[in-house]
Structures are given as structure tokens and as C-alpha cells.
């Protein structure tokens, strides 16, 4: 089976490695990133919000790039997003496998 992965390069490589580990040589993997994540400096006023929801590692990294510290409740979609959030110093209140369960 041939698989095309279009995520950003670093994420593509990690995903390809996981696929290779699970399926071995039965997959032919082609990595062809169609986007690159760039972080911008923006001002965010968190005061009116009760919590933050992160749906991807890129969202967590973008928030961390702002050097924001928060005591807001943090909700994550996916175990890996939650792991990245914790490594970034966020206190994760709740994690679900998809947004529908969150």
C-alpha cells in the first residue's frame, strides 16, 4: 500500500516512523509536506476566557512560543497534544481522543 503524508516535515517523519513500526514493509511511505508552520508574536488577552482548548501540537507550540503562562483550565484533543502541552509547562485538565468527546 502507498501512503502520502502531507503534514509539516518533522511531524511527517514522526508519523511515518510510527506507521513503519506498526505496518512494516507493507507500506510505501512518501513524505511531501504541503505546509510549514510559522509562529507569530501576537497579544492575547486571556482574562475573559475560562479555559483553553488545544487540538494539535502546533497549537500548543504556538501558544508556548508566546511565552504565556496561564492558570486557565487546559483541554486537549489527543494524547500527544496533551503530552506536548505538559512538556510546555501547561497543566492539562482534561484530554479526549477527539473533539466530539471533549
Task: Kindly label every feature range from the protein language model.
Residues 1-102:
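Signature of uroporphyrinogen-III synthase
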Amino acid at each position: 500500500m502507498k501512503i502520502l503524508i502531507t503534514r509539516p516535515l518533522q511531524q511527517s517523519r514522526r508519523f511515518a516512523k510510527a506507521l513503519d513500526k506498526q505496518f512494516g514493509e507493507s507500506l510505501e511511505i512518501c513524505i511531501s509536506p504541503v505546509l510549514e508552520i510559522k509562529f507569530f508574536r501576537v497579544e492575547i488577552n486571556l482574562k475573559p476566557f475560562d479555559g483553553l482548548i488545544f487540538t494539535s501540537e502546533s497549537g500548543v507550540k504556538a501558544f508556548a512560543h508566546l511565552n504565556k503562562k496561564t492558570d486557565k483550565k487546559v483541554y486537549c484533543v489527543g494524547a500527544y497534544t496533551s503530552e506536548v502541552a505538559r512538556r510546555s509547562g501547561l497543566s492539562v485538565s482534561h484530554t479526549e481522543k477527539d473533539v466530539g468527546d471533549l
